[in-house]
From Swiss-Prot:
Organism: Moraxella sp. (strain TA144)
Keyword Repressor applies: no
Protein name listed in UniProt: Lipase 3
Residue positions of the active site: H74, S142 (charge relay system)
UniProt catalytic activity: a triacylglycerol + H2O = a diacylglycerol + a fatty acid + H(+)
Family under the similarity heading: Belongs to the lipase/esterase LIP3/BchO family.
Catalytic class of the enzyme: hydrolase
Matching SUPFAM superfamilies: alpha/beta-Hydrolases
Xref: PROSITE patterns: PROKAR_LIPOPROTEIN
GO biological process: acylglycerol catabolic process
Residues annotated as domain AB hydrolase-1: 69-296
Amino acid sequence: MLLKRLGLAALFSLSMVGCTTAPNTLAVNTTQKIIQYERSKSDLEVKSLTLASGDKMVYAENDNVTGEPLLLIHGFGGNKDNFTRIADKLEGYHLIIPDLLGFGNSSKPMTADYRADAQATRLHELMQAKGLASNTHVGGNSMGGAISVAYAAKYPKEIKSLWLVDTAGFWSAGVPKSLEGATLENNPLLINSKEDFYKMYDFVMYKPPYIPKSVKAVFAQERINNKALDTKILEQIVTDNVEERAKIIAKYNIPTLVVWGDKDQVIKPETTELIKEIIPQAQVIMMNDVGHVPMVEAVKDTANDYKAFRDGLKK
């Protein structure tokens, strides 16, 4: 019963911060059981690949090897478990869900390039190693959306469709009022204390799911420990504009679904207007009373919208 009650909440918390070591062993062990339960429910197995750079990339994969590959890319501060819950609703596709370099259980080198093109190149190496680089569907949330755009722009002939969920990288649309004046010293996405983490949890989601404070504290410490790398990555991505690369998506007429929560405080919903201007073929869905992570806040609706989009590609 505990697993069912806390599954989504603990899963999201993990997706925002990762999970390695923490001071509260009981909380960590309990959360790991919850996460493993969710992965098992979605038929996901965790695997890893050593990249040409020598870095390790960890990823989750389901067992639907006959489905068309769908590469799902998490956002800043996240990891593969951002998509574990919704993976249960996307069982008709061959899911590949990585921890990006710098996040989750993948390597975290301080000297790496974490901009969209560099991350896209690493993901393409993963897909090539698995023999799945051709006829790929790609989707991403927030920073993962910007990386999805970069991936499609670098390898347009290999991409069958694109799914952008509250995507970053279209910076000329401006920032929401909630982030006006934010710097690396006061950005709510960078965690200096447990209190910062609690505020971030409520900031990112419009209706955050319940999670015990003791578990939050464990993950807060992880974010505190990772702050130096998080700061470096955030500094790189906030200046990494993908709008020119998005024009390649328009040029190749890659089918694109754009999904946004109308209560997103991290990246303004009006960004959809700019994306539609740059990528005219894009379909846009605005979700009511949803924040920055629709695939966590509105799992069923987000999955159904995506499946309808994919079904439309067959017509």
